[in-house]
Amino acid sequence: MSDNINKNGEFDIPETAQPAQYSWNNTPQPEGSNEESPVMIRRRVKSGYNWAGSIILWQQLFAMIGMVIFQMIYSAMVMPSIIADNPELTAETITAELTARMSEGSAMILMNSVCMLAANILAIIIVYFASKKFKFNEMFSKPDFPSSGIVLAALGIFGIQGFSILVQTLVTTLTGYTGMSETTSSALSFTDNIVTNIVLLLYVVVAAPILEEIMFRGLAMNLLAPVNRTFALIASSLLFGLMHANFNQIFNGFLLGMLLGYIALKSGSIISSMICHVVANANAMLLSYIFEHKLADTIGDKAYTYEFIAFAAELVIGGVALFFMLKKYGKVNQSDIITTSYTYEFEQAEEKKLTWSALLKSPTFWVSAVICLGSACLMLTQVTVS
């Protein structure tokens, strides 16, 4: 025992007894966190991954419940008129007529907008309060990023959208499939009804970007970020892409999520990523309105050629903007973070176990992936053949 007493009369703890698997960084930590053991920390990290994966589950669950309720209400409203117009209809033909009316643009847009709005809000509430990982207001801090960087990111979005459209066009040319069912397309397309178009714009351009940034950059990415920022960026972008649940948007969603996550981490706030997300959706809706809704009625298929040219131009502009943005601000590193209350540092070997290895063992991640990819595969049987 005397060999372990140093010259100051203090007991020397052997180096092998030190908990070398983790250490705290210099950011503020949750109350009582210094008393956590390595085992508790690992459990805390893995719990965060499970809550990140559950965001899609809650969203899909509430969306499904909402759509069932909406369909029941809509059926009760239009069924009397269907029967009155043709009292000799059979049960099968009534169901077919009801389905046809429900699939029309206005009804589908209203159902999709209202149900997804409610589903996103409820998913955010549950995951935020149940996970208890960080403070909500930290996500909305003032962006620590120059406005020129946000402008470059917004322009970079044009490049991502242009690239995605070119890839989708190539796939459609080779396979004949557009990648999106008529029902999904009608839920995201303009109609001749002004009120419906306003609802569509408010949801797609305003509500969806705000709520999705809270869900995937504010919650999911932060829940995935305590060990490695780059891992959190890629994993949250993967979840964001899967959330769209159709192959036409999964790829685009992943790339868009990477850029939005990058700008959120670099600026330390989801306000900047919200701005860029609004720009992305507004750009897509504007081009859709001009080329697919207005010009298509006057110049026919030439409108789609012009739309293709517009996206090709955006690819060039956005590509240049992304190049300068990445050159100026560099890659994501451990100093990039949105919230400061939930961060750990691990040795490299332990870090590998607590990133992809841990996420791939998360049941909520796999259930979410199966649901979203299953929906995308199911849509392949319903897509419009070009």
What do these predicted ranges mean?
Residues 1-142, 284-386:
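N-terminal, membrane-interfacial amphipathic/helix-forming hydrophobic leader that caps
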Residues 56-75, 151-167, 265, 271-279, ...:
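Hydrophobic alpha-helical membrane-insertion segments
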Residues 64-65, 158-162, 237-245, 279-288, ...:
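Aromatic-anchored segments of alpha-helical transmembrane domains
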Residues 83-84, 88, 97, 105-108, ...:
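Juxtamembrane helix-loop-helix connectors linking adjacent transmembrane helices
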Residues 116-123, 200-204, 253-257, 318:
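Hydrophobic core segments of transmembrane alpha-helices in multi-pass, intramembrane catalytic enzymes
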Residues 159-162, 185-250, 255:
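Function-critical hydrophobic alpha-helical transmembrane segments in multi-pass membrane proteins
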Residues 224, 232-286, 294:
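Contiguous mid-protein beta-loop-alpha structural module that forms a pocket-lining wall or clamp
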